[in-house]
Structures are given as C-alpha cells and as structure tokens.
Swiss-Prot record:
Record keywords, A-Z: Cytoplasm, Pentose shunt, Schiff base, Transferase
Active site: K91 (schiff-base intermediate with substrate)
E.C. no: 2.2.1.2
Membership in a protein family: Belongs to the transaldolase family. Type 3B subfamily.
A GO BP annotation: pentose-phosphate shunt
Main location: cytoplasm
Protein name per UniProt: Probable transaldolase
GO cellular component annotations of the record: cytoplasm
Free-text function comment from the UniProt entry: Transaldolase is important for the balance of metabolites in the pentose-phosphate pathway.
Pathway linked to the protein: Carbohydrate degradation; pentose phosphate pathway; D-glyceraldehyde 3-phosphate and beta-D-fructose 6-phosphate from D-ribose 5-phosphate and D-xylulose 5-phosphate (non-oxidative stage): step 2/3
Length: 222
C-alpha cells in the first residue's frame, strides 16, 4: 500500500518525507488556501511555483487540482499544470465536464486523478475515461452517516472484476482507523494528513514500554 500526504505545506511534506514512507502528495484548492490565507497577493503563478517546490521534495506523484468547471478550461489549465513537472497528476472533479477533461488527458499522456468521488458509478466512469487515480472521500461520507469505507470496498471490487488499472486513493482520511480499513479492503493508496501520519506511529503501550526500558537502562554504569 502506498502512502501519500494530503497537504500543501512544504514543512509537512519535508517532515513526512524524512520518515521514509512517503510515496506522493495530494493537494487541492482548500489546502492551498490554508497556506496563503494571510497573503493578499497570491497569484496563479505563485500557485504553480508552489506546486513546483513540492515536486522538488518528493519523488512521486503530485496531484494538482484544476480550479475551473468547464471541460475546455480544465483542459487548458491541466496542460499548463502538467508542464510544471513530470510527476504532476492533474486532479479533475468527477463531473460530466471533468470526465471529458480526463478522457482528453488520458489520450494525451497526462496523468489524472478523478476527485470528489462519492459513488461507485462515479468511480466506474472515471476508470472507463482512463483516470490513473480515483479519490473516494471517506470522511465526508462518514460525516453524513454513510459508510465511506463501504464505497472503497465497492470500487476495489468493481475494478478487480474488470481489470481496471485505475488506482484507488482513499481521501478525506480522518484517523488511523481509516488507514487500517483502507489496507484491509485492498485500496492502493491512502492520502493522509500529516497529523494522522504521526498518529500511525504512536501507541500508549510503546510509550509505556520505552519508559520502563529507559528506567532499567539508567542503572547501567557508563
């Protein structure tokens, strides 16, 4: 299973990369907005420059999302994003226009990530259009009392049934249990906030054991 980090923070990406477990990065307009919330002069050129900096840190897929809704505009913007770096994956929302853009990109060698996926039919359409990745948002489904992980299971089953090569990225991960469940149902990737990545390494019994080991080690003479 691959681990992506879901952030636009360069510091968080660097910290996660130092752990030796990072395979890629996903960003979106909301994550970008968090890091520039105090900036009044942030331009689209600044956005592209920031994405380029991310690509310099991680040797793996970096998802950068289009910020338009019409297919033609998505295509123009996506081609511009793809030109930033060979590892760029263009994120397109799973809409009718998004599907048109995904099909265009897949036909022209540009990798895509179908995002904002909330149903198995959306995921099936993404695979048929040639998306390289599909991102079901489990946390947001859980928020409305619907099983996000059941959606992931359905997508994995459908893709396995028909041999689709589209990789499933479990998105909107809120806690370590989401990561465990993603691995259990066979998702290819979980994209995880840095705060949750750190939680994956923690356990109270590990802390308790270390405390005891250090106490015992203290009695040894230099």
């Amino acid at each position: 299973m691959k681990f992506f980090i879901d952030t636009a923070s360069l510091d968080e990406i660097k910290a996660a990369n130092e752990l030796g477990v990072l395979d890629g990065v996903t960003t979106n307009p909301s994550l970008i907005a968090k890091i520039v919330k105090d900036s009044t002069n942030f331009t689209y050129a600044d956005f592209k420059a920031h994405i380029a900096k991310i690509c310099e840190i991680v040797d793996g897929p970096v998802s950068a999302e289009v910020t338009t809704l019409k297919a033609g505009e998505m295509i123009a913007q996506g081609e511009e994003l793809a030109a930033i770096h060979k590892n760029i994956v263009v994120k397109c929302p799973l809409t009718v226009d998004g599907l048109k853009a995904i099909k265009h990109f897949s036909s022209n060698g540009i990798k895509t990530n179908a995002t904002l996926v909330f149903s198995p039919t959306q995921a099936l359409l993404a695979a048929k259009a040639g998306a390289d990745f599909v991102s079901p948002f489990v946390g947001r489904l859980d928020d409305i009392s619907t099983s996000g992980m059941e959606l992931v299971r359905q997508i994995v089953t459908i893709y396995d049934n028909y041999g689709y090569l589209t990789e499933v990225i479990v998105a909107s991960v809120r806690n370590p249990l989401h990561v465990v469940e993603s691995a259990m149902v066979g998702a290819d990737i979980a994209t995880i906030p840095y705060s949750v990545i750190k939680q994956l390494a923690n356990h109270p019994l590990t802390d308790k054991g270390l405390e005891k080991f250090m106490e015992d080690a203290a009695v040894m003479k230099p």
